[in-house]
UniProtKB/Swiss-Prot annotation:
Gene: paxD
Protein name from the UniProt record: Indole diterpene prenyltransferase paxD
Pfam families, A to Z: Trp_DMAT
Organism: Penicillium paxilli
Molecular-function annotations in GO: prenyltransferase activity
Keywords: Transferase
């Protein structure tokens, strides 16, 4: 009896002990808690850390996932966080001989899409407010500043929403996404805001709005200005026009261990161009980021690009990949600004969901890349761990959505982002027959 109890994974044990307020939470726990548990197994988290992370997800994230999908599989609130509107993701970061688990989700409620909350803003406000007491450093000054700048009163939002005929744009216009990093005994919360609705309302470019909102912090923005100027110069450059790069959203930390003025600010760009030369142009902000470290970074980026993307034989660096039919296919970048830094740190998100190889071939490519980096921890055996975590009876349960790359110090900084295949996780009686009854 005791040995059977020891085999119960933390996600299942917590569900038995804590239960759920409704069937929607039960559904989201099944499709979110389980792959997260598997990812923590991969990252060698201790049992106590698994319970800590999962308890946080159970209390603060699962209730914000909103109603479960409709019987036909459609999401209650369509959003392009993932290509099929899945509003959750799990991820694992590899850097400096460590593996760190992360999550991301777009808070949703029953009011989302109604006249009470037409563009889905309320759930994010409620979620951040509920977490305020978790750590002394959870200062909401920046959150209030940016939501005041970009969240829109319901009366005005209802008018904007009614006037917008292109619903693809509406799904891209994510007002707020929350993500969480879980290093040892810590929780780091990041908020991402897309000012697309505000841009449509005031008829100003999103990049202009983002830069202005950061400058509007006044004295609190002083330490960001050097790096911000580099990004602003690129936004207004011919290189940005040629590469099709445009600012799409920005992010900042809220849950800090020290003063809010030490937060990072990240500005994200997107492009639909997939030529490798174009990737390098944007990654270097049109050559504004240079030097020996950047040369090493672009060399390693090429290796990862070749290892994971479905590149036709003979494709030149100045040629684009065959176009994806998916409406939001493209490449994302972010530029991380630290207070006092002269230049931002670049990151690129390789679009596996749109232009990547098959998942197991991506896993092979990641193995090759990791070996080339000299990484040899147990969690660096990428394909073996990926199969153990996310392949069951020959079916892929979590697909690669993106793989991000940046370069810090002397090494690559890699994060793999996964989209749970909800239809594979959705039958609780199959996945946890002892817990959920058919």
């Amino acid at each position: 009896m005791q040995s059977d109890e020891l085999q119960i994974p933390p996600w299942e044990s917590l569900a038995e002990g804590l239960g759920f307020s409704n069937a929607d939470e039960e559904y989201w726990w099944t499709v979110f808690g389980q792959p997260l548990n598997k990812l923590m197994d991969w990252a060698d988290y201790s049992t106590s850390e698994k319970y800590r992370v999962l308890a946080f997800i159970h209390r603060y994230v699962i209730p914000t996932c909103g109603p479960r999908p409709k019987p036909n599989g459609d999401q209650y609130w369509d959003t392009f966080m993932g290509f099929d509107h899945t509003p959750i993701q799990v991820s694992i970061n590899f850097y400096n001989s460590k593996a760190t688990v992360r999550t991301g989700n777009i808070p949703i409620s029953e009011a989302s899409g109604t006249t009470e909350d037409p563009i889905n803003q309320k759930a994010s406000l409620d979620t951040i407010a509920s977490q305020r007491h978790l750590v002394p450093g959870h200062n909401l000054r920046l959150f209030k500043h940016f939501t005041d700048a970009f969240f829109i009163p319901n009366e005005e939002a209802n008018i904007l929403n009614a006037e917008l005929e292109n619903r693809t744009i509406a799904m891209q216009a994510v007002q707020c996404m929350l993500s969480y990093d879980f290093p040892y005994r810590q929780i780091q919360t990041k908020v991402a805001i897309c000012p697309m609705w505000k841009s449509m309302q005031v008829k100003r470019p999103m990049g202009d709005l983002m830069i202005s909102s950061i400058k509007d912090l006044g004295i609190d923005a002083a330490d960001y200005m050097k790096s911000l100027k580099v990004i602003e110069d690129f936004i207004n450059s011919e290189k940005a026009v040629q590469s099709g790069a445009y600012a799409i959203f920005f992010a900042f930390d809220t849950m800090l261990t020290d003063d809010y003025q030490r937060t990072r600010v990240k500005i994200y760009f997107a492009t639909q161009s997939t030529a490798f030369n174009n990737m390098v142009d944007i990654f270097t902000l049109g050559g504004r980021l240079d030097g020996p470290e950047m040369q090493r970074a672009t060399k390693e980026l090429r290796k990862l690009w070749m290892s994971t993307m479905a590149i036709p034989d003979g494709l030149r660096d100045d040629e684009t990949l065959p176009k994806s039919p998916l409406p939001c296919a493209g490449v994302i970048f972010n530029f991380e600004i630290w207070p006092g830094a002269d230049k931002p740190n670049p990151k690129i998100y390789l679009p596996c969901a749109y232009y990547g190889k098959d998942d197991l071939d991506i896993a092979d490519g990641m193995d090759s890349f990791f070996k080339d980096q000299g990484w040899s921890k147990s969690f660096h055996s990428y394909k073996d761990n990926y199969i153990k975590a996310f392949v069951k009876d020959g079916k892929v349960m979590c697909r690669h959505h993106d793989i991000s790359f940046s370069y810090k110090g002397q090494g690559a900084y890699i994060t793999a982002y996964y989209k749970p295949e909800l239809s594979e996780y959705a039958d609780p009686s199959v996945w946890a027959p002892k817990l959920f009854k058919a």
